[in-house]
């Protein structure tokens, strides 16, 4: 199998090789972002669930976050709505970092693969025109080799889009817990 991969890259043009390396980097980035954000969001979601539970049980009067250190009006024992909204936006901004990478990969990888395919087919037609041979036995292997770049682009886009949707749902769940805390703390008088 390794021999066939080496043979493929030896027979491929520069653009196709560049496209396949680019798509491989996309795939590595997709896996890295997904694993990192999955772990980070799981920790953050657990923390906010516990914080909500503590606020409801009266064990704490604010989320455990640096923004709430000594920012309370001690006379009313309330936090300003602006501070609560700033905290919510900060948590959501932090939790969505990296999602744009998955979005970009899922939308551009198929086009990058298609670009590699088109360039490879153009090179093949150029070579066929030069050699003067245009039989099915000559054209079919060239086109099948060229389509590998498109397949690789689609292969990179599918997990990127799927992981994007999974992480987006986790961010939504986190936002619900954060909003519940904001609502509870805003209603305290």
Swiss-Prot record:
Please state where this protein is localized. Answer: Cell inner membrane
Q: Which UniProt keywords apply?
A: Cell inner membrane, Cell membrane, Membrane, Protein transport, Transmembrane, Transmembrane helix, Transport
Coiled-coil parts of chain: none
Q: Which InterPro entries match?
A: Biopolymer_transpt_ExbB-like_1, ExbB/TolQ_transport, MotA_ExbB_proton_chnl
GO CC annotations, alphabetized? plasma membrane
How does the record classify its membrane topology? Multi-pass membrane protein
The record lists the membrane-crossing segments as 14-34, 99-119, 147-167
Pfam families the record matches: MotA_ExbB
Report the leader peptide range. Answer: none
| Keyword flag Cell inner membrane | yes
Any single GO BP term: protein import
Name the family the entry cites.
Belongs to the ExbB/TolQ family.
Official protein name in the record: Putative biopolymer transport protein ExbB-like 1
Q: Which organism is it from?
A: Helicobacter pylori (strain ATCC 700392 / 26695)
